[in-house]
Amino acid sequence: MMHIKSLPHAHAAATAMSSNCDIVIVAAQPQTTIANNNNNETVTQATHPAHMAAVQQQQQQQQQQQQQHHQQQQQQSSGPPSVPPPPTELPLPFQMHLSGISAEAHSAAQAAAMAAAQAAAAQAAAAEQQQPPPPTSHLTHLTTHSPTTIHSEHYLANGHSEHPGEGNAAVGVGGAVREPEKPFHCTVCDRRFRQLSTLTNHVKIHTGEKPYKCNVCDKTFRQSSTLTNHLKIHTGEKPYNCNFCPKHFRQLSTLANHVKIHTGEKPFECVICKKQFRQSSTLNNHIKIHVMDKVYVPVKIKTEEDEG
């Protein structure tokens, strides 16, 4: 008996051989031949080389996946729990054999597993971002209700400026310029001031407080600037010099008044007699003359009728 693997070989063999020869045509696909010899069963399987290579590759992938799974379990047991990053390749939830399915089906299943893992990682990240913020400290909360803060908010809410002495003069009805407001007033004489520092210095007049003392003559002063100018008397320091004459002065204000002598400037004018002066203090003393002219004492003159 002769085994022929192709149809052309079968026709050639039929013409060459006699009629007593049996011809069997066998397909090209692998077959399994079972033979019994001395009660021992031998199984021979003929497999295509490409199929064997695919099976070996699948087995290697399964071994790698098992090793990765084992390493992940060891890391979870040794370290604190954390959200793992999305894996680049995931084992499928069921066993698949390349001999049973196509490569396209395997790729589709792998892509579905990757999408599910990425969705789980995104949910974990969103849960971490939605955690509540840390609670505000008690001291920070009390600061918002402190008396200074409440007073400042109430002061600004009523139309006052944060820096009363720095604002411009307000414009009233008809374009008339009003005096800048003076929100700080003295509780003793009810005098009002634009700045709190000016009120603080004014109150020292009523209390008699003079905290600044000269170390040379033991003279005391209400303001530190006055003490600074006083010390120049002992040191003989006169840092301000006139550009018109060789005179020197201890205070800048004294120099400014002296320069008006050379320039002839007299900015202070009396509203009654229109006389002008270089200094405001000289004008104030001049106004007292007009006030004293209006002060009189009624004197009754005796007449002859009164005597009779």
Swiss-Prot record:
Cross-referenced InterPro entries: Znf_C2H2_sf, Znf_C2H2_type
Region (Disordered): 50-94, 123-143
Highest taxon of source: Eukaryota
The name this protein goes by in its record: Adult enhancer factor 1
Entry's Gene Ontology cellular component terms: nucleus
Gene Ontology BP term (one): regulation of transcription by RNA polymerase II
Molecular functions (GO terms): DNA-binding transcription factor activity, RNA polymerase II-specific; RNA polymerase II transcription regulatory region sequence-specific DNA binding; zinc ion binding
Gene3D superfamilies: Classic Zinc Finger (3.30.160.60)
Alphabetically ordered keywords of this record: DNA-binding, Metal-binding, Nucleus, Repeat, Repressor, Transcription, Transcription regulation, Zinc, Zinc-finger
Compositional bias per record (Low complexity), positions renumbered to this chain: 56-76
PANTHER family: KRUEPPEL-LIKE TRANSCRIPTION FACTOR (PTHR23235), ZINC FINGER PROTEIN 384 (PTHR23235:SF142)
Function field: Transcriptional repressor that binds specifically to fat body-specific enhancers, namely the adult ADH enhancer (AAE) and the enhancer that controls yolk protein gene expression.
Record's compositionally biased regions (Pro residues): 81-90
Localisation: Nucleus
Tissue/organ expression: Found in all tissues examined including the ovary and the fat body.
Zinc finger (C2H2-type) stretch: 184-206, 212-234, 240-262, 268-290
Pfam families linked: zf-C2H2 (PF00096)
Intrachain disulfide bonds: none
